Amino acid sequence: MDDYQVWQDVPAFRRLYNKLDLSLRLGYTCGPAGVPVPKTAEYVVRPIINLSGMGATSYVQKIKKDIDHDVPLGYFWCEMFTGDHVSINYSWRKGELYPLNAVQGFNSKDELYRFSSWKRLPEIPNYDLPDWITETMGAHKLNIEFIDGKIIEMHGRHGMDFPENATEIVPVWKDTEAEQHVFYHNTKDWIFKPNYEDADGTLDNPRLGFYYR
C-alpha cells in the first residue's frame, strides 16, 4: 500500500502525514514558511506533506535568526537531529503495537534522499512512542522513522524494500558510476533487483533498483 492509499482509506491517519503538525506535537523547534527561526543554525527544510516518499525535495539549510523568507511556501523548517537513522516496522494486533523489524540507513546531509546503504538490525531498538500512538491503529501497519531515537515521520504502511532474508541493500541511482555496478555485479552474494522510484517525478536522480545480500 502506498501513502496516498492510506490517505484515502484511513482518514484518522491523515493528520500524521502532516510533518509540521507531527513535529509540533512532538515538541520540536519548528515552523512553517514565513516564521523566522529562533537562532542562526542549520535546519532541515521539508514539504509539510509529502505522499510521494523518498524524502523528495527535503534539504538542510543554514538559516539566519529573524530571517523569514528563506523557506519556500508549503515547506517548514525544523531543528536538525544527528545520530542513527532507523526505520522500524510495527503492526497492530488486538490493540497492541508490536515491532517487527528494523533497518538503519546511511546518507549525508548534502543529499537527504540519497541513501548509500540500508542494513537490517539484529535487535529492534526500544524507542519511546507518544501516548497518542493509538491514533495509528486504523492503519494496522505502521512504519516510523527515527533519528537519534526521535520520530521524524510516520507512515500507515510498512517501509523498506528488503527482500526476504536480505540483511543489506545498496541503492543504485541514475548517476551511480559504472564502476560501482561492476563491483557489486562481480562480487559474490550480491544480487541486483530492479526497483525504480522517482517519487512521482520529483527526483531528478531516480533510484533504479538495488543490490542486496
Locations of regions flagged by a protein language model:
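Active-site nucleotide/adenylate-binding loops and adjacent lid/helix of ATP-dependent enzymes
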Residues: D2-D131
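ATP-dependent carboxylate activation and anion-phosphoryl transfer catalytic cores
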Residues: M54, L97, F106-D110, W118-R213
